[in-house]
Amino acid sequence: MRSGDFDNAVIVLQRAIQKDPSNLELMKDLTMSLYLKRDYQKALDVAEKLTDRDDADEVCFQMAGNVYKALEQPKECDKLYKKALKKFPKSGPLYSEYGELLWSTKDYAAIDKWEKGIEVDPAYGGNYYNAALYYFFVKDKVWSLIYGEIFVNMESLSERGAAMKQLLLQGYKEKLFADVDLMQGQEKNKSEFARTFLETMNRQASLANQGLTTEVLTMIRTRFILEWYNQSAAKFPFKLFDFQQQLLKAGMFNAYNQWLFGPNENLAAYENWTKTHAEEYKNFENFQKSRVFKMPAGQYYQVR
C-alpha cells in the first residue's frame, strides 16, 4: 500500500482476510486501500462491517466517515458520527470531522461540535483549527485569536500553521483593534474569560494608534501578559498565556512574536531582524523544536 499499488494491495489484503477474517487491522487496511483507489462502494461495504464490530476503534469510524463523504451521502455520514460519538464521547478527531461534515452542508451547528471537541479533548489540534477559521469569518474577535494561536503552536511547522499565522495578523488588525473601544458590542458576551481578555487588551489599545507592526504587537502582548499575571491568571489558568510568560521570562518573546507575525507583516523587516538578532532567534528556534505544545484539561472558558 505504501508504494501506491493499491490494486495489488487489495488482492493481498483480501487473501489475508480470508485466512484471518476477524483481523481488525487487515480490514482497516483494506478499507483504506479501496478508498485510496477510489473504489468507494466496495470501501463502504468493508467500512460498514468494521463499524458494526464491538471492537471498532475511532479510526474505523473516521474511515467510514471519509467514505460516506466521498460518496456524497451526508445523512448516512451524520448517523455514523452520532453512533461513533456515543461510543467515543471524548474523541477530538470525531468531533472535528463531524463539524466538517456539517460545515460542508452550511450547517452552522458545526461550531458546536468543534467547541465540544476542544472541551473534551483539548490536546487534539484539529478542532482549534476549524473553530478559529469559523470565528475569523464571524463577528467574534477573541476566540479566533486564542484558538488560532493555540493551533499555530500545536502545528508550528505545517502549511495549515503557516496559513493560520497570516489570519492571526489579520485578526489583530481587522478585528481586535478595528474599534477604538475593544469592549464595543461585547455587552452580551457570556464568557467572563473573553470579557477579561478584551478588558485587558483594551488597556493596551492606545499603543495601536500609530498602526500595528510586529514591534507594536509585541509591546501590546507583553503588557497584556504582565497585567494578566498580575490580575487574572489565578482565576483563569491558561496554558497559552503560561507559554507566553515563559518566553517573556526567558528573553524569547520578541523572537516568538517575530516568528508569529513578522513574515506576513513585513517580510524584509523580518529577515533583517533575524539577521541582526541571529543568536536570539536561533535560541528560540531550538527551544521551539525541543517541546510539544498541548492544552491541558480544565481550561475551557468558552460559553455559548
Task: Annotate each predicted stretch with a short phrase.
Residues 2-3, 36-37, 70-71, 103-105, ...:
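Register position in tetratricopeptide repeats
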Residues 15-16, 49-50, 83-84, 116-117, ...:
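Canonical positions in the second alpha-helix
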Residues 21, 55, 89, 122, ...:
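Short coil turns that delineate tetratricopeptide repeat
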Residues 26, 60, 94, 127, ...:
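TPR alpha-solenoid repeat register
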Residues 29-32, 62-63, 97, 130, ...:
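Canonical tetratricopeptide repeat
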Residues 123-304:
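Eukaryotic alpha-helical solenoid repeat scaffolds
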